[in-house]
């Protein structure tokens, strides 16, 4: 759903809302229709003396553009359902609201009943970049930033500095690098070492009781799809332009990606399973599936609510018997997920003196999955980030390359520039948690 107040709508992770007043509170969970919901929140004014929070639903997709009104001939959802939980006394707290929401999500089989395995060491999430396309004037080429051998060398150094229980998310290792191509026609990049070196890396990771997650995009491609992609309500091809955190260093801005037909995901999943059956790794990291949700208006396409169910069902074979990771954390797929990275730990709207933010999502997920915020080495205030991570029960998360992208010594993604800070951060977080 989206969250809307006086400002424009921003994405919300959990389809829930509520109000606390004195010793009473309620929380409402949107059980059906959340994919097309917007939550409105308005504080009391001289016109309305009540604080208000309520949902609205975009039942029929509509778009107005170029003096033309486009209306779908199909409703987005067949049914709407909300569950209200009322709390009083000592349960009428933000923690109580989160607990009630978690209980209902587990009851609805949205969240798993499993709990996080408590080990001797705090998990440390590490995002590695395999290969990236770099611009050189009018030309561009794929450059290796972290080969499989280099990744092992980096992990050995981390181990020697006291960093244990590492969850490695390896991005940019298939065709196209970080500008990944259609996953059904992709293969491991030989310039990173190929299957043999990947297997050697996994053997080391497994022997050290770490985890290796291969990052994949199943909903988008930088090169399009052989059978065509999804289309929007205007019947134009659907695209998305993700942020490129390495843009400043690579000289390559973000590029449009074609969105896949969600109804064809079963074929995509089958291809991924076939192509990776001889590789050794812990599981997959679902990148775009953790962030994207869209309607497909092509023939036989699926609208948002049905698309959410289709994506959740599609990733099940990829996670069966294996641990899985995702990015950002779309809630409709969390039942199959063990680790979340890049989970928002700060408010999506600008702060003001009128309210304070509370860690509602971490309160709901704590103990069910391991989670981490955005990479700490991209933050400006390390001490503040440490305190927030400890308060929210989040794992440390760093994003590194083995090869520097810049030669000025200020490359925040070059691991040698921040590995000592990471070790110190990890030590403090381990003591606190």
Residue ranges: model-predicted function:
Residues 1-144, 152-166:
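Carbohydrate-recognition beta-sandwich/jelly-roll modules
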Residues 6-9, 14-48, 68, 221, ...:
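Active-site-proximal substrate-binding groove within the catalytic cores of carbohydrate-active enzymes
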Residues 91, 141-144, 191, 301-305, ...:
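Hydrophobic alpha-helical scaffolding
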Residues 91-95, 144-148, 195, 412-419, ...:
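Generic detection of long, well-ordered alpha-helical segments
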Residues 92-95, 99, 149, 196-199, ...:
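Generic alpha-helical secondary structure signal
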Residues 119-264, 283, 291:
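Aromatic-lined carbohydrate-binding/catalytic grooves of carbohydrate-active enzymes
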Residues 158, 287, 389:
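Conserved, mostly hydrophobic/aromatic
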């Amino acid at each position: 759903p989206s969250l809307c107040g006086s400002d424009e709508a921003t994405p919300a992770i959990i389809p829930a809302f509520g109000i606390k007043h004195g010793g009473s509170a309620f929380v409402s969970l949107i059980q059906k229709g959340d994919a097309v919901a917007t939550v409105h929140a308005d504080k009391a004014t001289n016109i309305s003396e009540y604080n208000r929070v309520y949902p609205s639903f975009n039942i029929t997709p509509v778009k107005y553009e170029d003096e033309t009104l486009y209306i779908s001939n199909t409703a987005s959802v067949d049914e709407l359902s909300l569950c209200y939980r009322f709390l009083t006394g000592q349960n009428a707290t933000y923690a109580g609201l989160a607990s009630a929401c978690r209980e209902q999500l587990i009851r609805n089989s949205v969240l798993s009943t499993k709990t996080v395995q408590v080990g001797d060491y705090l998990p440390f999430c590490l995002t590695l970049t395999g290969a990236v396309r770099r611009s050189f004037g009018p030309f561009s080429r794929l450059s290796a930033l972290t080969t499989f051998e280099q990744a092992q060398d980096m992990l050995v150094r981390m181990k020697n500095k006291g960093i244990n229980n590492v969850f490695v998310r390896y991005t940019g290792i298939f065709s196209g690098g970080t500008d990944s191509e259609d996953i059904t026609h992709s293969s491991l990049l030989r310039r990173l070492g190929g299957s043999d070196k990947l297997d050697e890396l996994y053997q080391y990771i497994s022997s050290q009781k770490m985890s290796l997650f291969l990052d994949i995009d199943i909903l988008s491609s930088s090169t399009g799809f052989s059978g065509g992609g999804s289309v929007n309500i205007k019947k134009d091809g659907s695209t998305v332009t993700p942020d490129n955190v390495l843009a400043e260093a690579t000289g390559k801005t973000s590029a449009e990606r074609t969105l896949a037909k969600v109804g064809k995901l079963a074929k995509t999943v089958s291809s991924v399973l076939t192509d990776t059956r001889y590789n050794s790794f812990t599981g997959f990291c679902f990148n775009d599936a953790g962030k994207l949700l869209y309607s497909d208006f092509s023939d036989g396409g699926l609208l948002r609510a049905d698309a959410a169910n289709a994506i959740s069902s599609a990733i099940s074979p990829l996670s069966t018997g294996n641990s899985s990771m995702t990015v950002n954390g779309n809630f409709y797929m969390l039942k199959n997920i063990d680790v979340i990275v890049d989970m928002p730990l700060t408010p999506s709207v600008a702060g003001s003196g009128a309210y304070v933010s509370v860690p509602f999502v971490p309160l709901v997920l704590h103990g069910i999955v391991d989670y981490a915020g955005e990479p700490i080495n991209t933050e400006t205030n390390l001490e503040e980030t440490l305190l927030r991570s400890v308060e929210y029960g989040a794992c440390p998360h760093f994003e590194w390359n083995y090869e520097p992208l810049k030669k000025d010594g200020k490359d925040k993604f070059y691991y040698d520039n921040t590995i000592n800070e990471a070790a110190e951060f990890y030590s403090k977080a381990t003591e606190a948690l």
